[in-house]
Amino acid sequence: MSATNDPTPAVRLSKNLEYLKPSETVSINQETQRRRAAGEDVIDLSAGEPDFETPRLVAEAGIRAIQQGRTKYPATAGILELRAAAARHLSLLSGGRPVNADHIVVSTGAKQSIFNACMTLFGPGDKVLIPSPAWVSYPQIVRLARAEPVMVPGDIEWSLKVDVRALEKHRDGRTVGLILCSPVNPTGAVYTRAELKALVEWTRERGIWLISDEIYRRIHFGSGPAPSVLDLPDELLGRVLVIYGVSKAYAMTGWRIGLALAPAPVAKAMGALQTHVTSGASHPAQWAAAEAFGDERLEDEVAHMVEAFRHRRDLVVAHFRQHMPGVEFVEPLGAFYFFFRVDTYFAQRRFSTAAEFCERLMADEGVAVVPGDAFGDPRWVRMSYAASEKDLTDALGRITRFVRAMEEATASA
């Protein structure tokens, strides 16, 4: 049926979606799957999830919960067993500091925890600072809360991180929030304890809420977990929320369990909000997550996964230094992402954005990566090394061939 004869009336969508953009990481993943289904040879380095399987003990706990009939509505803020296990886990990660399980709200993934936090704390007229480059969903979630995201560019001399001077330049009387991620998606940079302390003190002095996304905390290539705001004294944390979960460290992205640790009044409000959104996270999945947090036997599996990511990080860094020495990058200290710069090719008129670079790389070499446009900086590209060493080595060879072909074309022009 032609468009002119289509009897379907025009659809008028809500203004809530007026400024909302689809997730580019999801879109690229869908395009990768489409090409693979068509028989194309595509290596996917766009994924934001570990390539490991959920640990057997965790999977069995989820199956056992189903077999035991734990499939009814759960407590809205999360089953006590999971909140208690998460509190003990977070306490151990930060040297035994007390963590109150009553201040934890379990949600359907860390993304929903961030959504709940923004909907609870921010509203029309408010501004929320977001260090850039940043995960694609932060500004979109802030907009859904009817607040205004304010991107704060990171300093290349400082692994694209921000400090209080950068934040202060972008603050005004409407600034009420800061969303921080460490280890950082998309760069893999990690804020030190001293850097976190300076940021927390700055927000506290100005009455600004800090949402600290620590979903990658366990995937850290230094000693122990990455530094956390929970390593700081209690008196600094009155306006701080911590976002955490099982997706990354325990390879449980599809189980959809995340959590927020918040001051008591905020946790209560987030729980109330959740009663009207999801009524709580999947009941069997919560039991699986409780196993992940509570079973010490899983620590060896987490350590093995982190060591595998460290090895792959080293492989990628060494390859770029040896075979693409002219390409600038951020050396990652955590997570499983590698962020490299491509705007040198803009001046040569090969491309005008990182998105075009990624499109050509996919078309010419069959490698899927994510343009920095998605993260707020169109000069860069994010690739994930959450892939097998074989695929990673093959993809690095293809990227090198692609970059060299551009350089040769420029030299002969």
PLM feature segments, named:
Residues M1-L13, E18-S23, I28, R35-I43, ...:
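PLP-dependent class I/II
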Residues L45, A61, Q67-Y73, A84-S94:
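Glycine-rich loop-to-alpha-helix module at the N-terminal edge of alpha/beta enzyme cores
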Residues A77-G78:
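Short beta-strand to alpha-helix junction loop
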